[in-house]
Amino acid sequence: MAYTINKYSGATLVVVQDGTVDVTTDLTFVGKNYAGYGEIQNENFLFLLENFSGTSQPPKPISGQIWHDSTSGKIKFYDGTKFKTTGGAEVSTTQPVGLTSGDFWWDSGNSQLYTYDGCLLYTSDA
């Protein structure tokens, strides 16, 4: 009998058939009676424990997924479109795409802090 894997919202993410694995997301879902499930299950727990810590973002994120960017040392979350910093400012030399009202951007090329109001960016000295 297949396992139906539901999101927290109740929506079905995937159906995993007996004896198979599903790699739709950054975790591997194991079907009933899959030989060798133990290593997969334990790695899944480790990935969750370390918040997918690495120098590059997880390749198959789902909305709400947490990632520890080990290069910047920041915790980020996936908003359904991109990974966003969970606090503080977005840091880059170019204006980040997808800013929402109240977001900060630190222009590391010009050492300038900006605040976004939903339409315009304002400098911290304005």
Cite the ranges covered by each PLM segment:
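Extracellular "spike/adhesin" assembly and maturation modules
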Residues: 1-119
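Conserved small/polar residues in nucleotide/adenosyl-binding loops
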Residues: 122-126
